[in-house]
Amino acid sequence: MFIINTLMLVAPILLAMAFLTLVERKILGYMQLRKGPNIVGPYGLLQPFADAIKLFTKEPLRPSTSSVSMFIIAPILALTLALTMWIPLPMPYPLINMNLGVLFMLAMSSLAVYSILWSGWASNSKYALIGALRAVAQTISYEVTLAIILLSILLMNGSFTLSTLITTQEKLWLIFPSWPLAMMWFISTLAETNRAPFDLTEGESELVSGFNVEYAAGPFAMFFMAEYINIIMMNAFTTVLFLGTCYNPYLPELYTINFTIKTLLLTMSFLWIRASYPRFRYDQLMHLLWKSFLPLTLALCMWHVSLPIMTSSIPPQT
């Protein structure tokens, strides 16, 4: 039964990821006053499947000087971790209802750094290695603010379980009392998923394509899939944390529909930002985090800790 449940979670995620690639190309096309993919199938709807067939039937070439095992393990690990992070998300029922669901997701996103680092190092290419080092520095840096913002939200939630956020936000979305945190969280998720304007890892003019420059066919597709699955997952996580949906036990479908619509709107904003903003310079990227976000999130976290102590003389319940 557990295998069936897992498949029922994985299959829609993969399908959503496939169509997100198409939607992105369409939206970018229309924003640049062109059509986007429109040949394969009606309105180009079968384009993702054509891409998948093409990529997975090609020969997976690898550089002769690369480290074979690590070169192959890296994309598999990236995709596995991207799918694993969906386990504790309540939609409205999680696959496994974990007591420490938030910590699990933080741990999984930290592990994803290894797949990037291994891919860059195993490629034995200077461009791939520079891209990987950039990606790792960026991901680790922005995880600091993500963790502090999560801690502030959990102080309001009173539990590490994601399902209790539904109860916490029955009357009021957490985005209203903590909108500065929500804004910083959204920008940090952009950086965490290596999306524009923070896609420093794949600066075409300098690094060709970033850490996956030596990859082709199936392994390349796996990195691509992991990236887009992470985008959807981060937006779903944002929905759970800040835009909690009212849950009716008699109509759980309403929760799922509401949750999906919010996640889709957030994902659209990711695509809109990509079409609108130029890429940051690397020092600007790091200054934004260490000199702006980190002091502000720490101050807000201390505020959320001190508020219950000041108002009702109780320590925050977690």
From Swiss-Prot:
Designated gene of the protein: MT-ND1
InterPro entries: NADH_UbQ_OxRdtase_su1/FPO, NADH_UbQ_OxRdtase_su1_CS
Database matches in PROSITE patterns: COMPLEX1_ND1_1, COMPLEX1_ND1_2
Assigned protein family: Belongs to the complex I subunit 1 family.
Annotated TM spans: 2-22, 70-90, 100-120, 146-166, 172-192, 223-243, 253-273, 294-314
Upper lineage: Eukaryota, Metazoa, Chordata, Craniata, Vertebrata
Primary residence: mitochondrion
Protein name (database record): NADH-ubiquinone oxidoreductase chain 1
A Gene Ontology BP annotation from the UniProt entry: mitochondrial respiratory chain complex I assembly
Molecular-function GO terms, alphabetical: NADH dehydrogenase (ubiquinone) activity
